[in-house]
Structures are given as C-alpha cells and as structure tokens.
Design a protein with these regions (language model features):
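Transmembrane alpha-helical insertion/packing segments
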Residues: 1-50
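Alpha-helical transmembrane segments of multipass membrane proteins
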Residues: 2, 6-10, 14, 38, ...
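Membrane-helix interface/capping segments
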Residues: 44-62
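Alpha-helical transmembrane-segment detector that highlights a single hydrophobic TM helix
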Residues: 59-72
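Functional transmembrane-helix hotspots
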Residues: 80-109
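Short membrane-interface loop/juxtamembrane segments of multi-pass integral membrane proteins
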Residues: 102-130
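Individual transmembrane alpha-helix segments
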Residues: 124-147
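Short, charged juxtamembrane terminal tails flanking transmembrane helices
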Residues: 161-173
Length: 173
C-alpha cells in the first residue's frame, strides 16, 4: 500500500511531536494541526489514486475500501513507532506530564474531591498498562477512526464513468 506508507510516515512524524509538545507548546499546536489535517490528506491520496490508478473513475465501495486499507496500513506502521516509543524511550514521561497537568488544572479549577480522586485513579490505572497495551489501544483507535473516515472520503472521491464511454459488457452463457 503505497499511499498507506506515506500516511504512516506522516502519522509517525506527527507522533514524534506529541511528547515534545509537553515541553514546547508550539509543537503541541503543530501536532493538533497535523492531526486535523489527516482527513484532508486521506482525501488527497484517495483522489490521486482515483485519477492516476483508476483512470478517473472509482465507485463508492472501491474508494471506501482503498481509504480503509490506507488507514489500516498507516495504523500498523505507526503502531510499530508507538511500541518502540513506549517500550524504549518514554519510561513514564507522558503519564508524569499528564499528572502534572492535572495537578495544575486542579489548582486553577475548583474540583470536588471525588473528581480529583477519579482522575488520580485513571492515571494510576494507566501507569499499570504495558507498552503493548498502549500500542494496541492506539492501534484499535486508529483503525476505528480510519474506518469512520473512509465513509465520507469514499463519498467525496467516488466518480462514476460516462455511460457513453463504458462498454456494454454482457455475460456470456
């Protein structure tokens, strides 16, 4: 999957910005902007596939499947990056930063003790997850969101051929 590789590389680059965004706020903004750009990039790749590979004609089902497989392949590639990061690089950095953010937000926002305790329990539960757990969670999330994005992308990309140009093929008995 040619375009899935490009999308996966884009997601890996985007993921590199995620932990860096905790220390450099602009990178967090850039990460969010690139995340919002994923559907548009998926549309661009599907449109390029339609025009260059399919001769400008593609059905809804074909466009939907192409987009779905593109997102699935990208999800597999970025899952490798997620695993490498959480297994060998992170060492609890992301969860510690989230914990600091929660502490700062609790000081600013007036939270009840139950809300604070709930958030603490969520972070403590997340600390028990292994790198494989994080990777599988992100992988399943990426596949689900990719499946949902494939439907509108398929609708926007589909283009029916001109009936005058399509040959009338009848099945032979």
């Amino acid at each position: 999957m040619h375009f899935g590789t490009y999308m996966g590389a884009y997601w890996i680059f985007k993921f590199i910005l995620f932990p860096l965004g905790f220390t450099i706020p602009f990178l967090s903004f850039l990460y969010l902007s690139l995340t919002l750009g994923v559907p548009f990039l998926g549309y661009h790749y599907a449109k390029t596939y339609r025009n260059k590979v399919c001769g400008g004609v593609i059905s809804f089902a074909h466009a939907c499947l192409f987009t779905l497989f593109m997102y699935m392949f990208a999800s597999l590639l970025v899952a490798v990056a997620h695993y490498i990061y959480f297994q060998f690089i992170d060492h609890g950095f992301v969860l510690n930063e989230y914990s600091k953010l929660v502490d700062e937000a609790s000081k600013i926002l007036q939270r009840t003790d139950e809300e604070k305790e709930f958030i603490r329990n969520v972070i403590d539960t997340a600390r028990t997850l292994t790198p494989v757990d994080f990777t599988m969670q992100f992988l399943s999330w990426d596949v689900i969101v990719g499946s949902l994005l494939a439907i509108p992308t398929g609708l926007f990309v589909m283009r029916r051929g001109n009936r005058a140009e399509t040959p009338n093929i009848t099945p032979q008995p």
